[in-house]
A protein has these predicted regions:
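Short beta->alpha connector loops at strand-helix junctions that form conserved
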Residues: 27, 55, 74-76
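Residues lining hydrophobic/aromatic ligand-binding pockets adjacent to catalytic sites
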Residues: 35
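Acidic, metal-binding active-site segment of PIN/NYN-like and related structure-specific nucleases
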Residues: 44-65
């Protein structure tokens, strides 16, 4: 299940829908508007295999790694967010929910940076 934070711009949400990427957005299809950051992790733990995309870099923390979800911080301009979500979901290392679970990821023009569950070092990957 792909979840967008409520801070994702409507234009980017519509692009993802136009590309037929099945998404649910906090405050639209799931939960409520105004949900606090500290309420998001408990919400994700109640959902089935969620991948959560946010523009909020506060979620890029090794301490947030958990086997039941994936957190993805999209660190690009707002108007590029949908393109980076699609690019990430097509990446061979992250193209299934099983491959994504247990990671906290930051997407940027420079590449993909991630924390893996039980890992002591940040990993970086190139876009392919």
């Amino acid at each position: 299940m792909i979840i967008l934070d409520e801070n994702f711009p409507e234009s980017q949400r519509q692009l993802l829908k136009a590309w037929r990427i099945p998404i649910r957005q906090i405050g639209v299809e799931i939960s409520r508007k105004g949900i606090q950051d500290e309420e998001i992790i408990p919400l994700l733990l109640r959902l089935r295999q969620p991948t959560f995309f946010t523009l909020d870099d506060d979620f890029y923390s090794r301490s947030l790694c958990h086997a039941r979800y994936c957190l993805v911080c999209v660190d690009v301009a707002q108007y590029e967010a949908a393109a980076f979500v699609r690019r990430f979901l097509r990446h061979k290392d992250f193209d299934t929910e099983a491959k994504r679970r247990g990671t906290v990821i930051r997407l940027s023009h420079a590449g993909i940076f991630l924390w893996l569950l039980h890992s002591e070092k940040e990993v970086s990957l190139n876009w392919e």
